[in-house]
Amino acid sequence: MSAMRWPAPAKLNLFLHVNGRRPDGYHELQTLFIFLNHGDWLEFEPLTDTDLLTLSPAIPGVPDEQNLIIRAARLLQARLPSQQGAHIRLEKVLPMGGGIGGGSSDAATTLVALNHLWQAGLSEDELAELGVQLGADVPVFVRGKAAFAEGVGERLQPVELPSAWYLVLKPDCHVATAAVFQDPDLPRDTPKMALHNLLEGEWKNDCELLVKKRHPEVANALGWLLEYAPSRMTGTGACVFAQFEDEVAAREVLAKVPKGWDGFVAKGENISPLFAALQQVSDWGIAKR
């Protein structure tokens, strides 16, 4: 079978509330995920009669045993009745440590694409169960629908959000998720609320104040973006975003971004580009960009 390209889209947390800390150290959260039509691309060339996995280009400083793409492929290999491998090529667009799901999205795309290409036959639920072993955000990418998430992020309720465009800025810093959740200054007492109340209320990110204090670059980006539209941080950062009604308005602000800052404009999607690609493959047997 020839190589096939699959999208690994970005996500935004439109709000992120930390409701408490569990005895096992994980945090109880409430958050709202939406996908963007912008992200990495992964090309898979299936191999038969071998369990060889190769990834190019290698990600500097990330050995295979820590790479989520390789780890996802190996989890799926363990469920196969016969040896299958793959050459994988990564077109990296999303920043690491940005809070827009780069590594989690790559892992989910690997699970979904190789499940199809290897004809593994795992259900969406089974793929999501593999995904949560790699990270709390992986299941939402596997399921491919905008969602309200609770627990540690594993309880997902699909939602339909209004069409919107987003300007995303990536400050010049890397924020480690584990460090944020381990910080004693992180607020952990936001009361849990029903989804309909959350959708009608003011959206916030409980990690934002802490990250702004630890990373002035994030504070600077938010301060600049707030001059043009209500803005928040996504996930544990470092990316920040603002919502606009149309692409033109978002691009007008992007054109004013200070020199040296990275940013992009993307449309919010209730259905992940990965899910759309899977449907296309199922219907026509091909994946197109």
From Swiss-Prot:
It catalyses: 4-CDP-2-C-methyl-D-erythritol + ATP = 4-CDP-2-C-methyl-D-erythritol 2-phosphate + ADP + H(+). GO terms for biological process: isopentenyl diphosphate biosynthetic process, methylerythritol 4-phosphate pathway; terpenoid biosynthetic process. Keywords: ATP-binding, Isoprene biosynthesis, Kinase, Nucleotide-binding, Transferase. The active site is at K11, D137. ATP binds at P95, M96, G97, G98, G99, I100, G101, G102, G103, S104, S105. Belongs to the GHMP kinase family. IspE subfamily. Catalyzes the phosphorylation of the position 2 hydroxy group of 4-diphosphocytidyl-2C-methyl-D-erythritol. PANTHER family: 4-DIPHOSPHOCYTIDYL-2-C-METHYL-D-ERYTHRITOL KINASE, CHLOROPLASTIC. This is 4-diphosphocytidyl-2-C-methyl-D-erythritol kinase. It comes from Aeromonas hydrophila subsp. hydrophila (strain ATCC 7966 / DSM 30187 / BCRC 13018 / CCUG 14551 / JCM 1027 / KCTC 2358 / NCIMB 9240 / NCTC 8049). The gene is ispE.
